[in-house]
């Protein structure tokens, strides 16, 4: 997919087919049941692209992937926010592992970045990001976040649209999430962005997932009935007769944020986006801003989630 705005993502994330067709096979875990038994644990190791990582290194890589939201390399002042995000990511992995086993296809919301990819993305500042992710992984492994004694899925996004989605509006039974406003997210360097998708690209992605789908001949009538909340976060839409959530649509077609406006001209779909991610749960950018203002990990976690925090020693 072609990058047309300042998004903070690598160009390869917007390749029309290669990067997007892979997303078609990913199940949308966030639409499932979101609470697992208290006894769920995490695996000793995880294999990603034929490389075996210890669980701690895997968790560190998941944290690294989310640090793309930062406007500048992390400092000690950012630690509490990054640690809080790491604990939320760890909780989600524990939940997913408890219900599905650790199949990489079960992690559309828990993305991974290797240290090599970190070096390519962050360049000479990579060590600062790795150090911050290291510290956050250590904090996460000593912290359990739960809701009424159950492990739960705690979604995070890099940058919100400025208003986090109310889970009830999105049809999600997740009472531990809060509807919050994050006005400072609008000042993030990666807040505004955009991408494009050709009608042929849309057709190929849809046919890969729905081989029997009938595509309307008029390209401007293929994406319709877009419904958004008051913050502009897309809750649902219809794609060639298939109703899907905003989250599902963005993952399937590589749109970077559920807060988007779409135009279609001559078979080319253009998406203008605000924020980066699903705009639900915890905004990592907002969490870091809270950290810089003096909030600690517990205060940050408690701001975004109605959940209990337990130290594990």
Q: What is the predicted function of each stretch?
A:
Residues 1-313:
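Conserved, single-site charged/polar hotspot
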């Amino acid at each position: 997919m072609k990058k047309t705005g300042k998004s903070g993502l690598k160009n390869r994330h917007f390749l029309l087919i290669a990067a997007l067709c892979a997303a078609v096979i990913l199940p949308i875990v966030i639409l499932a049941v979101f609470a697992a038994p208290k006894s769920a644990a995490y695996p000793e190791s995880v294999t990603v692209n034929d490389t075996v990582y210890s669980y701690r290194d895997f968790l560190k890589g998941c944290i690294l992937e989310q640090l793309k939201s930062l406007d500048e390399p992390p400092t000690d002042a950012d630690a509490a926010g990054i640690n809080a995000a790491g604990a939320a990511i760890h909780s989600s992995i524990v939940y997913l592992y408890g219900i599905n086993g650790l199949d990489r296809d079960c992690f559309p919301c828990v993305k991974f970045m290797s240290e090599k990819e970190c070096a390519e993305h962050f360049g000479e500042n990579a060590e600062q990001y790795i150090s911050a992710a290291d510290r956050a992984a250590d904090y996460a492994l000593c912290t359990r976040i739960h809701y009424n004694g159950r492990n739960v899925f705690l979604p995070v996004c890099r940058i919100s649209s400025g208003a986090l989605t109310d889970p009830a509006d999105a049809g999600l039974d997740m009472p531990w999430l809060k509807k919050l406003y994050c006005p400072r997210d609008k000042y993030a360097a990666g807040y505004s962005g955009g991408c494009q998708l050709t009608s042929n690209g849309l057709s190929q992605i849809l046919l890969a997932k729905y081989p029997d789908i009938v595509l309307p001949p008029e390209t401007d009538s293929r994406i319709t009935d877009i419904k958004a909340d008051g913050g502009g976060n897309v809750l649902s839409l219809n794609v060639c007769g298939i109703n899907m959530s905003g989250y599902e649509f963005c993952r399937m077609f590589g749109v970077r944020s559920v807060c988007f406006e779409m135009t279609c001209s001559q078979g080319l779909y253009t998406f203008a986006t605000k924020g980066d991610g699903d705009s639900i749960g915890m905004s990592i950018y907002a969490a870091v801003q809270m950290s810089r203002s003096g909030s600690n990990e517990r205060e940050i976690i408690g701001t975004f989630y109605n959940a209990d925090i337990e130290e594990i020693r």
